[in-house]
Amino acid sequence: MTLCPHHWKIGGVSLNSKLWTAKILAEQPELIKQVHKNYFKAGADIILFETVPSLKEAKVEAEIAEEYGYDYWISFSCLSENIICEGTPIAECATTFAKGYPHLKMIGVNCTKSEYITGLIHKIKENCDIPIGVYPNSGEEYDAVKKVWFGKQSALSFEQYAYNYMKSGASAVGGCCTTVAKHVEEVVRAKKRFSEEQK
């Protein structure tokens, strides 16, 4: 499926501030909506709501986009191949957005361990028909106290992971935290291999 015949201007929204707390989200969703209006008015063709940890946050963001008629993607951050960071099953998230959100052009996962992605893709596919986009971390763990990444990268090569994601049904594949140029090259090789097999 080709989503765009031309180059898109994509606006990414992943805010790390006092605005994004469970308390504000629960008590003042209108405040969050107001903040997002400026992003839509800035001229992006599509808005990417990324690293979304909560289903409620995703629903607020979707409501804003639908209200103003803007196309958008939603990408969740996940703790395992079953749940997003707040603990909601990814299957429930996919079911929530399966119908009634005509401007939602892609749903997916980012800022998540590479080894969880294939399982997450399958669970999303089982519960909705929206194209899936994934861009995981390269595999290291983040120490929030020391603010450093540590540990080894994932067992498989990023190229093999990317290929597996494509085989599983992902329409878009990329990289998030600790991915660099070589990871992009690996995704390109995976895409070439996958495309050759589709001929």
Give residue ranges: language-model regions:
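Domain-level signal for soluble alpha/beta catalytic cores
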Residues: 1-199
